[in-house]
Amino acid sequence: MSRYRGPRLRIIRRLRNLPGLTNKLIESKKNQASGSDQSNQKKVSQYCIRLEAKQRLRFNYGLTERQLLNYVRIARCAKGSTGQILLQLLEMRLDNILFRLGVVPTIPSARQLINHRHILVNNRIVDIPSFHCKPKDIITIGAPKTYQSIITKRIESFAKDQIPDHLTLSLSEPKKPKGFVNYLINRESIGLKINELLVVEYYSRKA
């Protein structure tokens, strides 16, 4: 299954707000339903609940079905909680790191910067959005002038307290902002509201 490139509002109406996909907020149809309407709705199956959790994770991080399945398999082979390791793997992707630093408004925007070879990790150009960042990595945004003003405005409007503790943003060189990975992200710093166990259960027979 390929990466979704259609209307984003259609997705968040169905799956609720996904900060990585779009910064627009919308009240989901589930929340809009009145109490009487909710009582008449059919009982949602456990499969549908797990499927929705999986779809929320996939669309938020901009993954294909195959990519997400591969991440689940990697998480299963690692020591510790499979769900938390899965979230950690996704959060430490380069495209997501740029998003969490506040350099770009969404993960698709971060992917565009990376694909255009404007991002350096430890002084080396990285053009792979899925690149796995590690503690002590230094990420430099070396965008051309056409991007610099956009990035500067974005950073100025982004509250510093929104940057999670495992990351640090340095503006000592305004034209080349740098991000520092302090340590691996913990569960409390995950930006997406999700029950990762539902995703693990969904893939229990596939991974």
Swiss-Prot record:
The keyword Zinc does not apply. Transmembrane segments: none annotated. SMART domains: Ribosomal_S4, S4. SUPFAM superfamilies: Alpha-L RNA-binding motif. Pfam families: Ribosomal_S4, S4. Its main location: plastid. This is Small ribosomal subunit protein uS4c. HAMAP family: Ribosomal_uS4_B. InterPro entries: Ribosomal_uS4 (IPR022801), Ribosomal_uS4_bac-type (IPR005709), Ribosomal_uS4_CS (IPR018079), Ribosomal_uS4_N (IPR001912), S4_RNA-bd (IPR002942), S4_RNA-bd_sf (IPR036986). One of its GO terms (biological process) is translation. Keywords: Chloroplast, Plastid, Ribonucleoprotein, Ribosomal protein, RNA-binding, rRNA-binding. Part of the 30S ribosomal subunit. Contacts protein S5. The interaction surface between S4 and S5 is involved in control of translational fidelity. One of the primary rRNA binding proteins, it binds directly to 16S rRNA where it nucleates assembly of the body of the 30S subunit. GO terms for molecular function: rRNA binding; structural constituent of ribosome. The gene is rps4. Belongs to the universal ribosomal protein uS4 family. PANTHER family: 30S 40S RIBOSOMAL PROTEIN, SMALL RIBOSOMAL SUBUNIT PROTEIN US4M. The keyword RNA-binding applies. It is found in: Plastid, Chloroplast.
